[in-house]
Design a protein with these regions (language model features):
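P-loop NTP-binding site
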Residues: 1-78
């Protein structure tokens, strides 16, 4: 389970999208529960990072791309 603020989530997505050691990342999307129990929905590409409140969610983050390095990507969520 990952708990991050909206700012931390934005920064993490941006780093994953721009770190070549993660692979060729096209998109990062999913849901994350904040410390206060509220849900955030993330939908990020290199061109736009959209984070918005969500009424319901499931703790999941999906990284879409080619030649992805799971170990490096997972390190960003710790």
């Amino acid at each position: 389970n990952v708990h991050k603020s909206e700012e931390e989530l934005h920064e993490t997505a941006e780093r994953i999208l721009n770190d070549p050691s993660c692979g060729d990342v096209f998109r990062v999307k999913g849901f994350l529960r904040k410390e206060d129990g509220q849900w955030l929905e993330l939908n990020a590409t290199r061109h736009e990072i959209c984070i918005r409140p969500a009424k319901l969610g499931q703790e999941i983050m999906i990284v879409i791309g080619e030649k992805l390095n799971k170990e490096v990507i997972d390190g960003y969520w710790k």
